[in-house]
């Protein structure tokens, strides 16, 4: 029978940007924007407290995504607590393509393991990542949220895999976040069931180039971030996003739709302040770096 730890545990989880242009459902970056969450075992009941981004739109019951992830992780380890308190301080914008749902899922599984004494013996990092990717349905945001940095991920023989790669320290980014979100299910629903072979081949080549560009040859980022498979296809749901991507790219800036959108992510040199002028009225801009740390327990 598992023993639960006394007192609260806290975790910090980064925002993520997936796809990065051609790396659809396979490439992702952790970014320097973090949610912080705290949980503790109670004698009974469930208390969910939320502040910050998206606080008005999330439930305070068992349907809360972090709680669902925690329950799944507790099931994996064979023990449910008698009661739970969860406190979320959200910074990552919701429904904007910056991995808020993956951050919630990763936070949940990490918190659950930390609440069980010897939890590392009951669930390895690989097992938690597998569970988190199962819950999300694709690994490209979950992997960098869990492991940090730049991660190449996918599924092989029924299991998820994630491979970290170093990122050139010269690379920084800016996120242009629109005031209204687009649900991932809507953005994915616009994608065709099949694509021309030539487009798939072109994307494969650019995805390979993107790995080289991010890991040490950033001069190739503009060419490496071109996409044929998903960005233009989503224009109906986010026309202003695609207009900004095209305008930035025409000016030589490597810009992409972040995840399923509608945020735009643009890569820059060490200083991205010059890119702030491109921020549309009413949008928020975040100067970001690649976050080498993934989900981190706080003391």
What name fits each language-model region?
Residues 40, 145-147, 151-156, 215, ...:
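Short beta-strand-to-turn element immediately C-terminal to the catalytic PLP-Schiff-base lysine
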Residues 213-299:
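Glycine-rich, charge-dense phosphate/pyrophosphate-binding loop(s)
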């Amino acid at each position: 029978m598992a023993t639960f730890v006394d007192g609260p545990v806290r975790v910090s989880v980064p925002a993520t940007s997936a796809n990065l242009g051609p790396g659809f459902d396979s490439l992702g970056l952790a970014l320097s924007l973090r949610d912080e969450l705290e949980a503790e075992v109670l004698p009974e009941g469930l208390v969910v407290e939320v502040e910050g981004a998206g606080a008005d739109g999330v439930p305070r019951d068992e349907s809360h995504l972090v709680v669902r992830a925690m329950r799944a992780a507790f099931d994996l380890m064979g023990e449910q607590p008698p009661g739970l308190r969860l406190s979320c301080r959200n910074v990552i914008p919701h429904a904007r393509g910056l991995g808020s749902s993956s951050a919630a899922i990763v936070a949940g599984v990490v918190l659950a393991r930390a609440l069980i004494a010897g939890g590392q013996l009951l669930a390895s990092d690989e097992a938690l990542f597998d569970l988190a990717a199962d819950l999300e349905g694709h690994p490209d945001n979950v992997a960098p949220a869990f492991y940090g940095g730049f991660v190449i991920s996918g599924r092989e023989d029924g299991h998820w895999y994630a491979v970290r790669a170093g990122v050139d320290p010269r690379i920084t980014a800016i996120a242009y976040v629109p005031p209204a979100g687009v649900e991932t299910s809507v953005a994915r629903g616009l994608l065709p069931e099949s694509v021309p072979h030539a487009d798939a081949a072109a994307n494969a080549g650019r995805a390979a180039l993107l790995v080289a560009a991010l890991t040490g040859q950033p001069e190739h980022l503009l060419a490496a971030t071109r996409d044929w498979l998903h960005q233009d296809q989503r224009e109906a749901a986010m026309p202003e996003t695609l207009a900004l991507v095209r305008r930035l790219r025409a000016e030589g800036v490597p810009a992409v739709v972040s995840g399923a959108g509608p945020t735009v992510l643009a890569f820059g040199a060490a200083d991205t302040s010059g890119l702030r002028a491109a921020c549309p009225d009413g949008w928020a801009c975040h100067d970001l770096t690649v976050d080498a740390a993934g989900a981190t327990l706080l003391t």
